[in-house]
Amino acid sequence: MTDLIVFDKDGVILDLEATWLPVARAVAHYTASRIPDDWDGNIGGVDLLAAIGVDEAAGQIDSRGIFAAGSFADIRSCWQKMLPSHMIKLDQDHRYQQDVQILVDRHGRNQTVPKGEVEAPLRQLHKDGYQLAILTNDSESSAKRNMQDIGVLDLFCTVVGADSGFGSKPGPHGFLHCCQGAGATPAASIMVGDTMADYGAAIAAKAGDFICVADSIDDRPHQDIHHENVIDRIDHLPALMARRSLC
């Protein structure tokens, strides 16, 4: 029996590229602009984007890449290794972090795009008695703002971000906190996600199951994910849960 459904946010409830591609572009090109003029390397914004799984020319984000599956801390760590040794430390420079936050607010605010029809299935699941939670590698405040933008924040008993104090996925602690908040055991809780980080969190937390959101079975992040657990949009989730309850 399932009591709690824990959702990843981007690529599951939200259209990852439509919502976040403008932010990724802005932050990468700003970061490249901070490279000292005396460096003889050849790294630009396009290279920084490619390193985190973003193809700027094609306008595509790889669901297996760092941008889709990691946190902003993971992105900064990846970029720092590519940048000159005498450049600012991205995770320590306050001006850089403030400027990035301004860019995120400017390019991300009011740009929340759902991945198809999401409100109706989420409300149906809530009506069916499931508790719902969000577990994202984005920040908690950003996740709450996104859910408010699409009118579904009221449905979630818990929203956990990478900065909420429980670590980031694929660690288990965010998932376990969602379970604690809902009064549900991990075995009675499932994770709905699209990346290896989501699947890894479910495995680490000993979740009851994992539902994958992917365009096709071949796009699932791990071959151990059962074919019948792959859906292309969450509007298929209420019917899937109904079938599972009959088993």
Give the predicted meaning of each segment.
Residues M1-I5, A18, S33, E119, ...:
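Asp-based, Mg2+/Mn2+-dependent phosphohydrolase catalytic module
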Residues V12, T136-D138:
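Conserved phosphate-coupling serine/threonine residues in phosphotransfer and NTP-handling enzymes
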Residues D47-L103, G116-E119, R123-Q124:
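A metal-dependent, Asp-based hydrolase signature
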Residues R64-F67, N110, F166-G167, N229:
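Pocket-edge positions in alpha/beta enzyme catalytic cores
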Residues W20-T31, G53, I75-W79, Q97-V104, ...:
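Hydrophobic alpha-helical core bundles mediating ligand binding, dimerization, or RNAP-core interactions
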Residues R109-K115, T136:
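Conserved beta-strand/loop elements of the cytosolic catalytic core of P-type E1-E2 ATPases, chiefly
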Residues M1-E56:
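Active-site neighborhood of HAD-like aspartate-dependent phosphohydrolases
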